[in-house]
């Protein structure tokens, strides 16, 4: 009776570990397949550059010094525009 219980629990543990590992591999493979093409990344880059420079120009028109806008997502503001870090 004890041996049967130990065998069942061991099989259950192996099954759980195998299922978890399989799910992780599947998730990793989906992440590798689903990526933004370079053209989409370029469009995002251009959009952020435009937004930052326009924001800076609007601030200049108010007769105030242009304050550096905090750019997000790996960008920094330099020379009144967003630059990829």
UniProtKB/Swiss-Prot annotation:
The keyword Transmembrane helix does not apply. SUPFAM superfamilies: omega toxin-like (SSF57059). It holds the Pfam family Toxin_20. This is U4-theraphotoxin-Hhn1z. InterPro entries: Hwtx-2-like. Disulfide bonds join 52-66, 56-77, 71-82. GO terms for molecular function: toxin activity. Postsynaptic neurotoxin.
């Amino acid at each position: 009776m004890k041996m049967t219980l130990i065998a069942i629990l061991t099989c259950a543990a192996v099954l759980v570990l195998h299922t978890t590992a399989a799910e992780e591999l599947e998730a990793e493979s989906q992440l590798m397949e689903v990526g933004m093409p370079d053209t989409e990344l370029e469009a995002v880059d251009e959009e952020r550059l435009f937004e930052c420079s326009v924001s800076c120009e609007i601030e200049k028109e108010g007769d105030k010094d242009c304050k550096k806008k905090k750019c997000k997502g790996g960008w920094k503001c330099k020379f009144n525009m967003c630059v990829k870090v």
